[in-house]
Amino acid sequence: MHSVTERGGMSDNPDFGTFGRFVETPVAEMDADMKSAFEFTRKLRGQVPGPHKIWPANPTLSHTIVPTGAYFQTESTLSKGEIEIVTSVINGHWGAAYSNYEHEKIGEQLGHLPAAKVTALIAGLPTSFDDARQQVVYELASALAATRVVPQGLFRRAQELLGDKGIVDVTVLMGWFTGVSLTLMAYDVPSNATGLSQ
């Protein structure tokens, strides 16, 4: 096995690898199952970002969960802005440095959300949206992240504006990014992590 420094690790500290605490395996050294999971992710996503660098360590699970993330990239009933509202609310709740840093940029650049609103979402500060769908997505995600009851009035508005498909998209997206955040937190992945270029 290569040492962390031979693999381009963050430091000589044995507690850290190439991506936070995780020591990535170069593609050429992966066993068949791990390589299959890695390539499956690259095919679906076009790259192997963030926690996807870690998940091939459990190839069967990786094959199972990666399509969920890909669904939100291409087939969700939510707009990219709405997805980033949910993502910033739940990432902010968990406090994973890497995902908050990445999605602060993504929310602004790809979600077309105002910078002040994205930072408020991540920080758990109150904000609001002129678009009724974005507002109800924000309220629903905030209530769920705060482990509060979703009041009947909020649920009715969400059902009117998003439908049951949209509500399910919000809840499953929150679960997805909870998994993302907890993976990144367990491996202590810092906001400036890059990992191996492969």
Descriptions of predicted regions:
Residues 1-198:
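Hydrophobic alpha-helical segments
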